[in-house]
Amino acid sequence: MPWIQLTLSCSEEHAPQVGDMLMANGAQAVTYRDGADTPIFEPRPGDVILWEHTLATGLFDADADIKAIIANLKQSNIFGSDLQYKVDALEDKDWEREWMDNFHPIQFGENLWICPSWREIPKPEAVNILLDPGMAFGTGTHPTTAMCLRWIDANPPTGKTVVDFGCGSGILGIAALLFKAEHVVGIDIDQQALIATKDNAERNKVGDKFSLYLPSQQPETQVDLVLANVLAGPLRELADTILGFVSPGGQLVLSGILERQIEGVIEAYQPHIKFDTPTIDGDWAMLSGTRVG
């Protein structure tokens, strides 16, 4: 069955609404891509982390009235007469090949890779996460996740207990376990994220060491390392909860923070955390530190 692919250019702020509009107009699937071709492996459930310039692509049946769909989109306050779009016709095999061709093994730090299952592993002796992102998972990795993965690579949590707070696809917890962490507790507000994490952990043969909870069920525990890749707002609002997981002398990694939000997030965790120098990647920042009180 042939398909029609409609790609729209929009801002990060409007991308989730654009995706909703594409689905409301009959799209069978929606993917997001950075306008500069920076891909993503891990979106946030209910709060998609995107980019300053985003391409949202809807996949429609071949008999969809694309002209009418475009006319509908032009009526929105988001686009109006400034709608920028591209229409492509794809055969089934073309869509599948195009989607798969967008995924390649990606290296983080010295010894950590993410590898789609259909690609040859470039470095078998390295730590390799096997991750087959579905269409909703985009086409690569966002800087917030990449910084965390590089931190894990540089600070292997061997023998440590870990909380992956806002686990999403489970990629950070899986990385910790593949670096020989003792156990990971994953927490997320989205049940579908927990299902995805469970599947990904089992694919990487660490499912027996990855316990998963909704916030209402999360255990009262303290661990050696807490990884929280969410957004600055929740990091501030949930500071007491997140701090409660960090054992004395334990480590804390916070990501999903814009550079201009660093000071506000640090204030929420002082005086309990002694932070290292922030890690910066583009407009994004990651904070790491040690619990001192």
Swiss-Prot record:
Membrane-spanning ranges: none
InterPro entries: Ribosomal_L11_MeTrfase_PrmA, Ribosomal_PrmA_MeTrfase, SAM-dependent_MTases_sf
GO molecular function, one term: protein-lysine N-methyltransferase activity
Residue numbers binding S-adenosyl-L-methionine: T145, G166, D188, N229
Localization annotation: Cytoplasm
Signal sequence region: none
CDD domains documented for this protein: AdoMet_MTases
Entry keywords, A to Z: Cytoplasm, Methyltransferase, S-adenosyl-L-methionine, Transferase
Primary localisation category: cytoplasm
GO biological process, one term: methylation
Pfam families: PrmA
Domain of life: Bacteria
Family, similarity comment: Belongs to the methyltransferase superfamily. PrmA family.
Protein name: Ribosomal protein L11 methyltransferase
Species of origin: Idiomarina loihiensis (strain ATCC BAA-735 / DSM 15497 / L2-TR)
Gene responsible for this protein: prmA
